[in-house]
Amino acid sequence: MLDARYIRENLETVEARLKTRGEGVDIALFKELDGRRRELLQQSETLKALRNKVTEEIARLQDKSQAAERKTEMREVSQQIKGIDESLRSVEEELQNFLLTVPNVPNETTPIGRSEEDNVVVRTWGEVPALSFEPKPHWEIGEGLGILDFERGAKLAGARFTLYRGAGARLERALINYMLDLHIDEHKYIEMLPPFMVNRECMTGTGQLPKFEEDLFHMEGVDFFLIPTAEVPVTNIHRGEILKGSDLPISYVAYTPCFRKEAGSYGKDTRGLIRQHQFNKVELVKFTSPEDSYEQLQKLLGHAEEVLRRLQIPYRVVELCTGDIGFSAAKTFDIEVWLPGQNCYREISSCSCFEDFQARRAGIRFRPEEKAKPEFVHTLNGSGLAVGRTLVAVLENYQQADGSVLIPEVLRPYMGGAERIS
């Protein structure tokens, strides 16, 4: 959430930078609500100061009739204050609800653009494999090996659900454990295993609510949501807390299943594992000081990249333009993995800095020093990685002409020493 004072003092800048997102923001409504709030606040404070002053005068009056008259006047003032404060609460709630719908201001270094066509390729890693045969997409590989069962997945739950079988289920589990071990043992993240359902406050804190409720799975009869990403519960671990500056940066990693309606994806990626209602993901989350956040973003991005480097799978890093970054993000880098069966790069991770946008919504602060005034932390997160899409990348990049799939060396200890799925 943006700070009302920041918007007020930087109206033209905020409006101009939000326009680069391709979203119009009702600045006139903000000015009206903010102006009314400040006016009512001033009226309330003026009358309260008057009441306090007269109360002190009454205590000094010797004339009881005069004191009674002044008390009557103050009862009227108190009624005025009550009415003004009720109006103030109403306006503050309206202003708060408005601010919750305003996206984050893109960082000034974020490339300006309208869509993914304007994103900037930062670097590529690895060579695209030159296969001596026509590569298959992962759904054909998985069905051919009997390790992915899309038909029975649909029978169990409908479209965009998959049943993993045998070596497919074990490969998914191997990827999860490999990613967790790498991030915990070498990158020094603290592992978390959060609830897979959260309350409305959590979803509001990270920015999914109120704007994107239709994309979420809501539990009927109770106000819980299935998590769309571990970002939601893990970021909210410190909701409403004041952290020690000496403890920053704090780095958490969490494996969770994720649940998404994919409401705007009708007709897209209808085959395979790319776009599912339920999928597994390993998430990286950081809490940092404002001064350190962009350095930590590069570290987080590097940690996510390392997963693919050790798997020896080609990828590229893309910086998202202002028209393509998410609602809460100030800057985002995507990692896109090469998929020979589809002859293209596909997103496998988004790594973002939200600056204080989420922290302000969730009330996450820190003290730079022991007795210093609390400040909002900066939050960061990124996939490290999306597990199903990593499995897709393994199947397509390690496929062999005979239909089998070689197992990357780093995964073999997690696969009982097996070298091939056939």
Swiss-Prot record:
Principal location class: cytoplasm
GO biological process: selenocysteine biosynthetic process; seryl-tRNA aminoacylation
Keywords: Aminoacyl-tRNA synthetase, ATP-binding, Cytoplasm, Ligase, Nucleotide-binding, Protein biosynthesis
Listed GO MF terms: ATP binding; serine-tRNA ligase activity
Catalytic activity: tRNA(Ser) + L-serine + ATP = L-seryl-tRNA(Ser) + AMP + diphosphate + H(+); tRNA(Sec) + L-serine + ATP = L-seryl-tRNA(Sec) + AMP + diphosphate + H(+)
Pathway of action: Aminoacyl-tRNA biosynthesis; selenocysteinyl-tRNA(Sec) biosynthesis; L-seryl-tRNA(Sec) from L-serine and tRNA(Sec): step 1/1
Binding site for ATP: R260, K261, E262, E347, I348, S349, S350
Similarity comment text for this entry: Belongs to the class-II aminoacyl-tRNA synthetase family. Type-1 seryl-tRNA synthetase subfamily.
Subunit structure: Homodimer. The tRNA molecule binds across the dimer.
Top-level taxonomic group: Bacteria
GO CC, one annotated term: cytoplasm
Compartments reported by the entry: Cytoplasm
Gene3D superfamilies on file: Bira Bifunctional Protein, Domain 2, Serine-tRNA synthetase, tRNA binding domain
EC number: 6.1.1.11
Enzyme kind, highest EC tier: ligase
Organism: Geobacter sp. (strain M21)
The protein, known as: Serine--tRNA ligase
